[in-house]
Amino acid sequence: MIVNEPDSMLQLCARDSQEYSARCRIQGIITAMPLISAALFDGPGLRTGRMLGQLVGADLVTKVVVTCPENQWASAITKVDSKKLSLTDIELISGPGLRRLLESIETEYLLIVLAGECVEFTSGALERMCTVARESGAGWLYSDYFDEAAGGLVNRPLIDYQRGSIRDNFNFGSVVLISTEAARRALELHGPIDESVKWGALYDLRLKISSRLRIVRLPEPMYTRVKSETGPAGQFDYVDPSQRLYQAEMERIATEHLKRAEVWLPPSFRQVDRDAANFPVKASIIIPVRNRVRTVADAVRSALSQTASFEFNVIVVDNHSTDGTTAILEQLAASDHRLIHLIPKARDLGIGGCWNEAIYSTHCGEIALQLDSDDLYKDHLTLRKITSKFDESSYAMVIGAYTIVDFDLNEIPPGLIDHQEWTRDNGRNNALRINGFGAPRAFYVPILRRIGFPNTSYGEDYAVGLRISREYEIGRLYESIYYARRWEGNSDAALDAAASNRYDSYKDWLRTVEMDARRRMLSE
């Protein structure tokens, strides 16, 4: 239900917008401004009445469409100019809903407040957004924003949209401004949104618009996001079993976009040449580590406990630890010759750089398997299961499934991450949409050495997975063979906004480069 506010509050909000519009008219601004239709994409939440008052009170806004059961809005409608309001019970995120919305729009721009969000626009925000959209030629525009906090407002900068920003969970904030003409032309050129689409209509529209026009970020806060009662999107939404129908729809939409962009790859793969040079062992388990005194011994013992009919070793690349990790590794290496303790000369290595130290060393085996210094193999058969998978087909990379656990190995949500969405026909294409390949990862080293890892500490595995999948087939194991531990000292613990932006931007850049490379490969 909407939180009812006093009549005076809604009237004040509308009056504030009208007073700003009056000042703009005096300055000769509004006469040159395009008009806007606004849409609120779901039912009322906290303080939605104030947001509604702002929109109906703005001269630029000629229409406000709300999708919600009418009885939830009856009280709010009586407090504002209802001539601008249009109610619908059709889900605007669906194909039929968005089609009907676009057909009803007669203004130059469509302003959408995304599902579950409530905002308060800054003074002059609508005028500023329209100006930037017009002058930049944007088909789709979004902006930075403020968040409410106990100490006041916190600026929330977003990241710029790239050609590779094709993931369906790209963070546009709470508000987007869409050129009506751009939307209609995109649908005329690339086809209408399918009537069967339940959740991905905006995603499909965005990708179609981006094929010809810019998606523009306005790096100024245009609104304050009011705290909502819903939590943030999960890091593992794309592999949550409860979301598989949703994810399948998103994959279909992304696949069509990749085909239009001429970067979609058919399921034909380059064969792996198994006539490799001699290696000291069949397999090496690679553990990069820095300052994991609490967990590194568990990881190493898990690796050394593997049973196999072939020789293997464990290569730990100790990235100049300062917390006692080095001493623990020295003790373990002294008691088991299979443990190779490497300390690189370079002091500027990320996780990817540490992987390079291991795979280019003379100790590395023919197959390199991943084990993070926080994590454990599920049992003593993990090594055997992964290496056996390489023998089934011409795989350059094999990926298993894992279970997320706490420090004491108790399963925590979402539990099993098995990437059941992966298919031989389309897995490497859908990999451009999602955020990761899974774990544990294993590589055929002769091919891995030709590629190498980027010297980063985030996304280095994703970069290599994309590069390998461009040419070679990736094998999958769907049973859990790995424990991924989450605890307060873990590098996958909750990230701050700046780190999340940096990581998301880097992965979008990787996708951009990979899409360019695939397009060139297909044109040769």
Regions found by a protein language model. Give the residues of each.
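Short, acidic, metal-binding catalytic loop of nucleotide-sugar glycosyltransferases
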Residues: 28-31, 52-62, 301-311
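A conserved acidic beta->alpha catalytic loop
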Residues: 68-76, 117-119, 318-328, 347
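A conserved hydrophobic helix/loop-capping motif in glycosyltransferases and polysaccharide synthases
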Residues: 32-47, 66-69, 283-295, 299, ...
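Catalytic beta-strand/loop signature of glycosyltransferases that borders the donor
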Residues: 216-226, 398-401, 475-481, 486
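Glycine-rich, basic loop-to-helix element that forms the pyrophosphate-binding segment
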Residues: 92-104, 345-363
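Conserved donor NDP-sugar-binding/catalytic core segment of glycosyltransferases
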Residues: 123-155, 381-414
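A recurrent flexible, glycine/aromatic-enriched loop bordering the glycosyltransferase active site
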Residues: 154-182, 420-442
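Acidic donor-binding loop at a coil-to-helix junction in glycosyltransferase catalytic cores
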Residues: 195-205, 457-464
